[in-house]
């Protein structure tokens, strides 16, 4: 008997989420409105941050954040190459240059030392990445950014619910979270910008909605004049209340969802111990891991087959997997522009990374199924 296909990720959506979305549909106000305002308030309260601004995607959030920081043609932004390519794309589309740095081979995160070595006279910002639910060594990065007077914008797309040295990621400084369909907290598409910089937050809020000082719901609820004025040209990155309502329920469930992810990840670590799979290493500092992804490194010499063949073998057994990620500088567009750039750790991992199924609705026997499939694949290659 064939088993149902097990995807590498699936959103955990229950009756409460469905009811919340239905309530918005019946309310007559489905775009940006009261659900957005509540989501921003609840998210800021959870993190203990000063400002939270909801947007339609983390890519859009990064776009307006860098724009609000004044980044444009001739500027440089330091970021790890081993991340989703949207970061490099946004920097490039602003007319700036992404300066790619290598990552630690085992944690897949960049160090303060690597970032500082890449700083030049045109460096205007640093965009480091919290990876797979694990956390950057923020103290070192904050010290470097402060010493050079450079903006630090944390890519926290993988880190909703993560903690660094006892405090939530995003409690201090500026960070961007993703609510994409596979993230720990999802509303299908969405994001949250957080910051303790009031001027930056105000400009991000303005730029996300046409450069207007207020949105339609703000004008309605506060009795302001019906025609708002453009303060500066902006974009259309506001989050609909349909999405915000879904995110609010997910935010209430976040601790339970992440606890389940942790339990599943711990079971994987137990079951796969001793196999030549090289799961990611953990940083030395105290943290709470959100376990957004469970990543293996499939080395052909150690495992008897390469990553792509391993993924095909999983697929043949009804198990999905993913690659997070191919380093940005290896993509055609960026390789053409920086043909000599060599980042050994990013390149080594790009050829070996494999994300296996991890999502809260997985059963314990799903972990056993994946583990047995992996054992079978490796055994056949010995």
From Swiss-Prot:
GO biological process, one term: response to antibiotic
Essential cofactor(s): pyridoxal 5'-phosphate
A GO molecular-function descriptor: pyridoxal phosphate binding
Known EC number: 2.6.1.87
Keywords assigned by UniProt, alphabetized: Aminotransferase, Antibiotic resistance, Lipid A biosynthesis, Lipid biosynthesis, Lipid metabolism, Lipopolysaccharide biosynthesis, Pyridoxal phosphate, Transferase
Catalyzed reactions per annotation: UDP-4-amino-4-deoxy-beta-L-arabinose + 2-oxoglutarate = UDP-beta-L-threo-pentopyranos-4-ulose + L-glutamate
Pathway: Nucleotide-sugar biosynthesis; UDP-4-deoxy-4-formamido-beta-L-arabinose biosynthesis; UDP-4-deoxy-4-formamido-beta-L-arabinose from UDP-alpha-D-glucuronate: step 2/3; Bacterial outer membrane biogenesis; lipopolysaccharide biosynthesis
Modified residues (N6-(pyridoxal phosphate)lysine): 183
Taxonomy, superkingdom: Bacteria
SUPFAM superfamilies linked to this entry: PLP-dependent transferases
Top EC category: transferase
Family: Belongs to the DegT/DnrJ/EryC1 family. ArnB subfamily.
Entries under PANTHER family matching the protein: DTDP-4-AMINO-4,6-DIDEOXYGALACTOSE TRANSAMINASE, TRANSAMINASE
Function: Catalyzes the conversion of UDP-4-keto-arabinose (UDP-Ara4O) to UDP-4-amino-4-deoxy-L-arabinose (UDP-L-Ara4N). The modified arabinose is attached to lipid A and is required for resistance to polymyxin and cationic antimicrobial peptides.
HAMAP family from the UniProt entry: ArnB_transfer (MF_01167)
Quaternary organization: Homodimer.
Protein name: UDP-4-amino-4-deoxy-L-arabinose--oxoglutarate aminotransferase
Source organism per UniProt: Pseudomonas paraeruginosa (strain DSM 24068 / PA7) (Pseudomonas aeruginosa (strain PA7))
């Amino acid at each position: 008997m064939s088993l149902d296909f097990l995807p590498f990720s699936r959103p955990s959506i229950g009756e409460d989420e469905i009811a919340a979305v239905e309530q918005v549909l019946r309310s007559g106000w489905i775009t940006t409105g009261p659900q957005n305002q509540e989501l921003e308030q609840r998210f800021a309260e959870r993190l203990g941050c000063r400002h939270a601004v909801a947007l339609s995607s983390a890519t859009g959030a990064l776009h307006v954040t860098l724009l609000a920081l004044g980044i444009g043609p001739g500027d440089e932004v330091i970021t790890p190459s081993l991340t989703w390519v949207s970061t490099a794309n946004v920097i490039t589309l602003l007319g700036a240059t992404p300066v790619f740095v290598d990552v630690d081979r085992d944690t897949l995160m960049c160090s303060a030392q690597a970032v500082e070595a890449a700083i030049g006279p045109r460096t205007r910002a640093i965009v480091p990445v919290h990876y797979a639910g694990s956390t950057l060594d923020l103290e070192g990065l904050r010290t470097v950014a402060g010493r050079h007077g450079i903006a630090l914008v944390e890519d926290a797309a993988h880190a909703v619910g993560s903690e660094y040295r006892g405090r939530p990621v995003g409690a201090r400084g500026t960070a961007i979270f993703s609510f994409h369909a596979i993230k720990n907290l999802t509303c299908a598409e969405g994001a949250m910008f957080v910051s303790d910089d009031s001027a930056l937050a105000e400009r991000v809020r303005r730029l996300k909605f046409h450069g207007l000082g207020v949105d339609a719901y703000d004008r309605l609820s506060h009795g302001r004049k019906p025609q708002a004025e453009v303060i500066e040209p902006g974009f259309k990155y506001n989050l609909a209340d349909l999405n915000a309502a879904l995110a609010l329920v997910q935010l209430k469930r976040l601790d339970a969802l992440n606890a389940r992810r942790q339990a599943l990840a711990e079971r994987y670590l137990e079951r796969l111990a001793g196999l030549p799979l090289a799961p990611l290493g953990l940083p030395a500092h105290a943290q709470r891991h959100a376990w957004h992804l469970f990543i293996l490194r499939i080395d052909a010499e150690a495992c008897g087959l390469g990553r792509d063949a391993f993924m095909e073998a999983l697929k043949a057994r009804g198990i999905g997997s993913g690659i997070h990620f191919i380093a940005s500088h290896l993509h055609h567009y960026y390789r053409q522009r920086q043909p000599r750039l060599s980042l050994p750790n990013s390149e080594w991992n790009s050829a070996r990374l494999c994300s296996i199924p991890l999502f809260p609705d997985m059963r314990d026997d799903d972990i056993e199924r994946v583990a047995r499939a992996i054992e079978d694949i490796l055994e056949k290659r010995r």
